């Protein structure tokens, strides 16, 4: 008979217990051991508990048990956890810290990674999945972590690489934390606001008046329109500053905010596409804010795939989609950033916005150079273009947007549209899936 030491404190058990509300962690598969002699406990701790009162399932790879080496039993424990999480409609959090496959097991450990990947793939879009990378995450573990909806890394501790540690760059984390406790706090924050599963919704009582007027500029617009100025940004370090994504409550309803503020890049478009896809999976309304002149001037043709993914994301999403042009929406920036033509349910523009195929400067240079005279300056022609061709009323008259509003009305109009669309039901033609670009 084996010795009774399931409550031995290890690095993995410490991490998983500290993640949950105090006293709520319940371990599953605690007695599972590896090897023929059965002397070593498996290098992953699994269990469930409460996060701000919500059920969640967590596995933590245990660096104190054979450095968290991955084998068939490791995958079996994780599969047990995933089966329970999906049946109960609760999110999964994975704490990654493993040296990799247990090489003594040969192909069995390699097949175990396939089992792990299948668990993550089948749960994708069913329950939220968040990876916290607190230590080593290499090779196929890095592939699995990238399959999660969002990953949280820790400065100075996360070691993410495919083949050699000196190539550890380029991983797109949703959040980069200063330390492990902040990483856990960020994961708990996300779990507390997100729906528990794809049949759930997320609402929050608020005292922030839906009808309050707002004042904003392009730097603080998000904080001005969301409830209590509380915006949880994700993927901040991916794709540049010109594309911002994150979660907030607007009128008590959870929304995914996508904000294009500057020249669009392929990486920024890819980030927005992933975020919109997540929101669509869990019925989270997407609010798009637009202030862009379109493509960045120095992009290569390879960026087209990122923009193609963005187009797919908007056109295939059936969740409520609301777009507001708050500055410029020029050329491809208008079309790709949640326009009505790619599926927005409601789109409006503030009075001072500009919607046009070209900027005023380019329009005059390409189309009106011959009209520049001593009496008609380039500047006056550009002003005429903005007034006559880029005026949002022109777009409204053509049915490209639904309304032109005062900027002070932005929050109340967003709230009204969100409430109207809260019971939206839309179906798409039957198919397996879209064929995404590479």
Model-based region annotation:
Residues 1-438:
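Ligand-binding clefts of soluble mixed alpha/beta catalytic domains
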């Amino acid at each position: 008979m084996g010795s009774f030491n399931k409550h031995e404190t290890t690095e993995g058990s410490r991490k998983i217990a500290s993640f949950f509300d105090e006293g709520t962690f319940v371990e599953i598969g605690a007695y599972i051991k590896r090897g023929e002699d059965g002397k070593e406990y498996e290098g992953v701790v699994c269990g469930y508990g409460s996060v701000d009162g919500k059920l969640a399932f967590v596995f933590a790879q245990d660096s104190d048990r054979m450095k968290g080496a991955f084998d068939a039993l490791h995958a079996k424990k994780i599969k047990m956890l995933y089966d329970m999480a999906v049946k109960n409609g609760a999110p999964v959090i994975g704490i990654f810290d493993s040296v990799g496959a247990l090489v003594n097991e040969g192909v069995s450990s390699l097949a175990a990674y396939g089992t792990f990947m299948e668990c993550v793939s089948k749960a994708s879009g069913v329950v939220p999945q968040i990876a916290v990378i607190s230590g080593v995450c290499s090779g196929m573990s890095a592939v699995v972590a990238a399959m999660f909806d969002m990953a949280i890394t820790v400065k100075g501790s996360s070691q993410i690489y495919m083949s050699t540690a000196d190539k550890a760059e380029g991983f797109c984390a949703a959040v980069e934390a200063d330390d492990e406790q902040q990483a856990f706090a960020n994961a708990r924050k996300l779990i507390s606001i997100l729906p528990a599963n794809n049949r759930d919704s997320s609402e929050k009582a608020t005292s922030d008046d839906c009808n309050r007027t707002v004042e904003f500029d392009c730097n603080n617009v998000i904080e001005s329109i969301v409830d209590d100025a509380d915006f949880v940004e994700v993927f901040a370090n991916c794709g540049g500053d010109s594309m911002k994504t994150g979660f907030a409550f607007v009128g008590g309803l959870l929304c995914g905010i996508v904000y294009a503020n500057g020249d669009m890049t392929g990486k920024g478009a890819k980030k927005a596409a992933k975020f919109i896809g997540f929101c669509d999976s869990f019925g989270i309304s997407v609010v798009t804010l637009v202030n862009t002149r379109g493509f960045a001037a120095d992009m290569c043709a390879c960026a087209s795939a990122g923009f193609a993914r963005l187009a797919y994301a908007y056109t295939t999403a059936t969740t409520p989609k609301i777009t507001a042009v708050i500055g410029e929406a020029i050329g491809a920036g208008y079309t790709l950033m949640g326009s009505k033509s790619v599926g927005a349910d409601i789109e409006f523009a503030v009075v001072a916005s500009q919607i046009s195929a070209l900027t005023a400067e380019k329009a005059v240079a390409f189309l009106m150079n011959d009209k520049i005279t001593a009496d008609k300056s380039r500047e006056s022609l550009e002003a005429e273009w903005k007034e006559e061709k880029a005026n949002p009323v022109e777009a409204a008259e053509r049915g490209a947007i639904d309304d032109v509003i005062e900027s002070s009305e932005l929050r109340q109009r967003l709230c009204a549209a969100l409430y109207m669309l809260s019971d939206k039901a839309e179906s798409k033609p039957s198919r397996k899936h879209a064929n995404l670009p590479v």
